[in-house]
């Protein structure tokens, strides 16, 4: 792996005029991004923040439920979101929000400033009001639309602000970008268990269970579904698992899970390859071969996962057609491998273009995005596909998109 480089200097030891302009432009973008996040956060906090759960939920209203035994990555409070529906069906949704796999990534949580400037930013480390818009009232979590086939379901959104795929159990000391000693609380597993206690208290006997997740939450689905069904909902027999975008190959996942996240042995011991998602899925199905319906979704040239892939391989937080092509080829292989361990798994493959053309690639996740309702070439939306699958009608969508020999986007 290459080492990270600093911006080049001119022969005189100072930045060139062009570099100075670039630095100033980045600073302006950073300030603008921070300002936009603050404005949106204040708006949510003052006018649109989900009410605190008071013990008497109104149907189809999202509530925040703080959990006293849980903690976000920066040590601040942790809450989940709950919604009561009109049925006995329950969706447990694992939120995404990046990953920290070493000291460098731990020191660079997501901020509006970093995103706007294109600076490395790897994971959300708290649940500030701004994060609400990523968690509820979009895609599968919409409540005010008849087009959502899950609108009548009960929901528990297990939020995520720990950078550990929901399985960490340790505290990690790192040096921040400004030189301060900080602690990243990898408490994802404890947050998960506290969330499940609340879920069982509110929704004790679901007739149907959908365990779903996007991005980092998609990795948690195979890691934690066995615990959910063994310990918390052992009597539910109608269970569907769905992961949206869980592909990031890295040769040191076992070391990260064991030594950085301090995850329990049950999570790091099955990790033998560079594909943590595949290893966790193989472990889950080897011990519970006929327990679940299994679903997976991805876009073909995911701009964000390819950025992370490039960072893992080359220590460059960027994406381009070459790394997107590599991501595509890895996706082709992963789909083959998933089908080999779960012949009945159904796939939803799409190629919706990323909304920032300069970066290229395809979008990252769809289940909690407007793309959830967008029709594919086969005239079916993810919403329809997922609803059918939860009722036992499994089908593949978009598999022809994986038949290219040379990938480009």
Sequence positions of predicted segments:
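C-terminal His-loop and adjacent cap/lid subdomain of alpha/beta-hydrolase
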Residues: 2-409
């Amino acid at each position: 792996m290459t080492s990270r480089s600093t911006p080049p200097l001119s022969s005189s030891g100072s930045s060139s005029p062009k570099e100075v302009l670039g630095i100033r432009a980045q600073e302006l973008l950073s300030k603008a991004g921070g300002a936009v996040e603050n404005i949106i956060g204040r708006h949510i906090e003052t006018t649109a923040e989900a009410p605190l759960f008071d013990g008497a939920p109104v149907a189809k209203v999202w509530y925040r439920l703080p959990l006293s035994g849980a903690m976000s990555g920066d040590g601040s409070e942790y809450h989940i979101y709950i919604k009561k529906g009109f049925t006995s069906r329950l969706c447990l949704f694992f939120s995404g929000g990046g990953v920290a796999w070493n000291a460098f990534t731990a020191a660079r949580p997501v901020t509006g400033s970093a995103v706007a400037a294109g600076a490395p930013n790897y994971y959300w480390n708290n649940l500030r009001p701004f994060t609400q818009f990523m968690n509820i009232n979009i895609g599968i979590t919409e409540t005010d639309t008849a087009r959502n086939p899950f609108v009548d379901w009960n929901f528990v959104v297990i939020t995520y602000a720990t950078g550990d795929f929901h399985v960490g159990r340790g505290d990690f000391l790192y040096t921040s970008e400004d030189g301060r000693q900080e602690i990243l609380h990898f408490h994802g597993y404890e947050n998960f268990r506290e969330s499940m206690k609340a879920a069982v208290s509110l929704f004790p006997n679901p007739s149907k269970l959908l365990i779903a997740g996007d991005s980092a939450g998609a990795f948690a689905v195979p890691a934690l579904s066995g615990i959910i069904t063994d310990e918390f909902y052992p009597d539910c027999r109608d269970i569907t698992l769905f992961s949206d975008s869980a592909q990031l190959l890295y040769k040191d996942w076992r070391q990260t899970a064991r030594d950085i996240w301090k995850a329990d042995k049950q999570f790091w011991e099955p990790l033998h390859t560079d594909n943590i998602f595949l290893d966790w899925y193989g472990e889950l199905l080897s011990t519970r071969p006929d327990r679940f319906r299994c679903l997976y979704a991805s876009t073909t040239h995911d701009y964000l996962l390819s950025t992370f892939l490039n960072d893992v391989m080359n220590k460059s937080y960027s994406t381009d057609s070459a790394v997107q092509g590599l991501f595509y080829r890895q996706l082709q292989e992963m789909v083959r491998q998933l089908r080999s361990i779960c012949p009945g798994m159904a796939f939803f493959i799409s190629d919706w273009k990323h909304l920032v053309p300069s970066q290229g690639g395809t979008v990252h996740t769809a289940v909690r995005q407007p793309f959830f309702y967008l029709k594919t070439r086969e005239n079916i939306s993810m919403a329809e596909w997922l609803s059918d699958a939860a009722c036992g009608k499994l089908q593949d969508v978009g598999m022809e998109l994986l038949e290219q020999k040379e990938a480009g986007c």
